[in-house]
Amino acid sequence: MQRGKKYRAHKEKVDSTKFFSIDKAVELAKSTSYTKFDGTLEIATKVNYKSLQNIRGTISLPHGTGKKIRVLVFCKGDKQNDAKAAGADFVGDTDLIEKVAGGWTDFDACVATPDMMKDVGKLGPILGRKGLMPKPKAGTVTTDVAKAVNELKAGRIEYRPDKGGVVHLGVGKVSFDNTKLIENIRTVVQTLMRDKPSDAKGEYLKTFSISPTMGVGVKVDVKELVNTSI
């Protein structure tokens, strides 16, 4: 794929044959961002495990992602007051289910109480396609809706690898100071290693790179990153 002049100019800042420490990688990646808006710094790490469907979970970033998360909560009665008090953007039961069934999905995360899942489950073709279906394992099917909303607003993100075994995650805005970005990245590594399947063999994280929304990818010394993060 032919890259533009801006990309090629910034690519000269990064030696693609080298693997950098996390501190240097963050510094370099930020320096190659050429968006007019405040771009996101993203990580990509390849996991070494065959049963990819078993690798998934949530990560609570200490400094959030910098993105305003719009949270929808399906619940009834007093739970609606709890969700609203916690800062949920959209709260309801059958009325919201009907709205989503009509194709409306202007939200970034979805929470539901267990008693709502029979009806919410019918929204699978809509919510599932966008990765918005509430799941017990992700903490989004729960009776404690306030806790779920607070965590999502604070920067809890869900992770799962793509078909190639690569986990892609946004870990903050380019405008974040380096220390906050590095702490977010180390939290990602700590969580992935903590959740590593017990039968995983060899090096679990095979590769690790950082890149801005529009900019150059920087390869990280994954062994050093893991050893200094856990």
Curated annotation (Swiss-Prot):
It comes from the Bacteria. GO terms for molecular function: rRNA binding; structural constituent of ribosome; tRNA binding. GO terms for biological process: regulation of translation; translation. One of its GO terms (cellular component) is large ribosomal subunit. Keywords: Repressor, Ribonucleoprotein, Ribosomal protein, RNA-binding, rRNA-binding, Translation regulation, tRNA-binding. Gene3D superfamilies: 3.30.190.20, 3.40.50.790. CDD domains: Ribosomal_L1. InterPro entries: Ribosom_uL1_bac-type (IPR005878), Ribosomal_uL1 (IPR002143), Ribosomal_uL1-like (IPR023674), Ribosomal_uL1/biogenesis (IPR028364), Ribosomal_uL1_3-a/b-sand (IPR016095), Ribosomal_uL1_CS (IPR023673). Belongs to the universal ribosomal protein uL1 family. This is Large ribosomal subunit protein uL1. It comes from Leptospira interrogans serogroup Icterohaemorrhagiae serovar Lai (strain 56601). The lineage of its organism: Bacteria, Pseudomonadati, Spirochaetota, Spirochaetia, Leptospirales. The gene is rplA.
